[in-house]
A protein has these predicted regions:
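Hydrophobic core segments of alpha-helical transmembrane domains in multi-pass membrane transport
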Residues: 29-42, 82-88, 118-120, 201-207, ...
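Entry/N-cap segments of selected transmembrane alpha helices
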Residues: 93-121, 191-200, 347-372, 433-437
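Hydrophobic transmembrane alpha-helices of secondary-active transporters
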Residues: 63, 67-96, 247, 328-349, ...
Length: 458
């Protein structure tokens, strides 16, 4: 049984393992997609690549139409689904996960704050005086969960599970900060009629939630209409995904049925009445780690011979949607985003490109600013007794985590695309993001490999 590996605050073991598996595999695919984009960008296929990205895609119903090129459909359309998934993860963590209490949220919140402030200050200091370049101040503030977990997966049991959880929590808070930054700082002029339509959609979503509608289809229909309204309003269309996630129903810890089942399950574990059909960690969210070979990983009900214990996820719309979106985001949407946004021309490239203030600001913000910010703010937080290091984690291992936080990629490239229309600036951003993310991943890997010891699961 692996019930003690997280300390007292246990996250859902089975769900967490599915998350790690998908995110890490998705991270590896993301790397492959980025490499392919760079290779295509510097091959005879470059013109075909640009033709595909800029091919017009028109959707028209009567007088209404959305006319965007394929690149914009990826960044405005598919990435709205990515933001929906990220927001669902944040909501789940806030309701009953690693961000559900002050004790749990303190460390990742403080670390993420440092990882936001210091990289941004480094970028601003290097680009002070250039008003156009300053628009990219938020680019080095993000962490890519998929890439970072992909690196951790290569280390296997050398990395404590509590360290993985902390990295995920920091990255989730980073994503939340990035969402707020996009909403506040990267919004163009607004159009009132679509905004009113968006407001009406939000009212309908609220009514669905208050009516305790657990079917997902009504939320998806209204969410699609909301996306159209947000797109037409001048706000960035990906914010629609964030708003929809706010209204997807989720059962919290206060549900009376859940409390009753908690009592039964704890009694079974304490008295040893389980029949061997299941073993694992049961916490206040009533999750079970299934180990029987005849049970697949998606099973949510286990018959112990005494009572039927049903996890809350079986009836939880939030979990169902999050679980359903993960594979599409990890294996389709993010690789497509990388293919469309990671291409960098190496023709005529020289060292001058790497010492441009924008490139340096992004690269040093991620490579130096992230670990410095995470380590400094964590040290201050621990000194002031606001937080403590994760269970079974030493400072040298935590430094490895801080280095991995410098892997920006997806969100950094996304913000870079919003900050700059000029292709020259975007090339500098890509150089900075890709160089720093690669260096952060390599340094983080070897730091954790040297400092880590094999974790024995019992």
């Amino acid at each position: 049984i692996q019930g003690s590996m997280f300390g007292e605050n246990v996250m859902p073991v089975r769900m967490l393992r599915e998350f790690f598996l998908l995110e890490s595999a998705g991270g590896i695919l993301l790397v492959i997609a980025a490499v392919i984009a760079i290779l295509i960008f510097n091959s005879p296929l470059e013109n075909y690549y640009h033709d595909i990205l800029h091919a017009p895609v028109l959707i028209q119903l009567g007088n209404f139409s959305i006319d965007k090129d394929f690149h914009h459909w990826i960044n405005d359309g598919l990435m709205a689904i990515f933001f929906l998934l990220v927001s669902l993860e944040i909501k789940r963590e806030v309701l009953d996960g690693q961000l559900s209490s002050r004790a749990q949220i303190s460390l990742p919140m403080i670390a993420a704050l440092g990882g936001l402030i210091v990289p941004s200050l480094i970028y601003i200091s290097l680009n002070w005086g250039n008003s156009t370049a300053l628009q990219g101040w938020a680019i080095p503030a993000a962490t890519d969960i998929a890439f970072a977990l992909g690196v951790l997966t290569l280390l296997g049991s050398r990395v404590p599970e509590s360290l993985k959880l902390t990295l995920v929590s920091i990255a989730i808070i980073d994503d939340l900060a990035a969402i707020l930054i996009i909403a506040v700082f990267y919004t163009e002029s607004l159009s009132m009629m679509p905004l009113l339509g968006a407001l009406l959609c939000i009212v309908v979503l609220f009514a669905l939630t208050k009516g305790k509608i657990s079917e997902l289809s009504p939320y998806m229909v209204v969410g699609t209409l909301l996306w159209v309204c947000v797109l037409k309003s001048g706000l960035h269309a990906t914010l629609a995904g964030v708003i929809v996630a706010m209204f997807i129903p989720a059962k919290g810890k206060g549900d009376p049925v859940v409390k009753e089942r908690i009592s039964e399950s704890v009694t079974l574990i304490e008295t040893g009445d389980n029949t061997g059909v299941f073993r694992g960690s049961i916490d206040d969210r009533l999750y079970v780690e299934l180990v029987d070979a005849d049970l697949n990983s998606s099973a949510t009900e286990v018959n112990t011979g005494e009572v039927n214990i049903t996890t809350r996820t079986e009836q939880d719309p939030l979990y169902r949607l999050e679980h359903g979106l993960h594979i599409w985001v990890a294996f389709l949407i993010l690789p497509l985003f990388a293919l469309a946004n990671a291409g960098v021309s190496l023709k005529g490239l020289n060292l001058d490109f790497f010492v441009e203030p924008v490139t340096l600001g992004v690269a040093l913000g991620l490579l130096l600013g992230k670990p410095i910010g995470v380590m400094l703010f964590t040290y201050i937080g621990i000194t002031l007794k606001f937080c403590s290091l994760p269970t079974n984690v030493e400072w040298k291992q935590y430094f490895g985590l801080a280095l991995l936080a410098g892997i920006g990629f997806t969100m950094s490239l996304f913000i870079g695309g919003l900050a700059f229309d000029d292709e020259g600036f975007q090339t500098l951003v890509r150089l900075g993001v890709i160089t720093a993310s690669l260096a952060s991943g390599v340094l983080g890997y070897f730091t954790l490999r040297i400092s880590g010891t094999k974790q024995i699961n019992i």
